[in-house]
Amino acid sequence: MVIVPKKNGKWRVCIDYRELNKATLKDHFPLPFIDQVLDTLAGKKYFSFLDGFSGYNQIQAASEDQDKTRFTCPWGTFAYRVLPFGLCNAPATFQRAVLGIFSDLIHDCVEVYMDDFTVYGDSFEEALENLEKVLIRCKETNLSLSHEKCL
C-alpha cells in the first residue's frame, strides 16, 4: 500500500492488485472512441463539463468480491465495499454503470467518457434544460459530482 498526493492536495490510497488482476477474467467492455464523441459535439454551441467525484468509489463492489480487495496496513486489515482504483476491470465496470445511468440521454444531450460528462445544446436555453436533466439523473442515482472540476 502506498499513499500518493492528488492534484487537489488530497491523498489517494493505492493497493497493489497485480496478482488479483492476473487471476481476473478480463472484461472487454469498450470505452467510447474519443473521435466519435468529438463528432457528436461538433457544431454544438453551449457546453457544460461535469466530473464524477471519486468515480470508481461510487460503484458498489459485489459482496462476493469484496474480500478479494482485502489489504493489511499498520491500522488493521480492510476490504473495499466499493470499486477500488487499480483493478483491471474497474474502467469497464465504471463505464458500463455510467452508460446505464445516462442511456436515454447519450447522443441526445450528454456524452460520457469515464467520469467526464459533457452536456451540450444548440441554444443556451436548451443547454440549461439538458444540464438540468443530467443533474436530476445524477441526484436520482446518487451519482456525486466534483464541484471543483465542473465547468
Task: Name each model feature, range by range.
Residues M1-L151:
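Retroelement reverse transcriptase polymerase core
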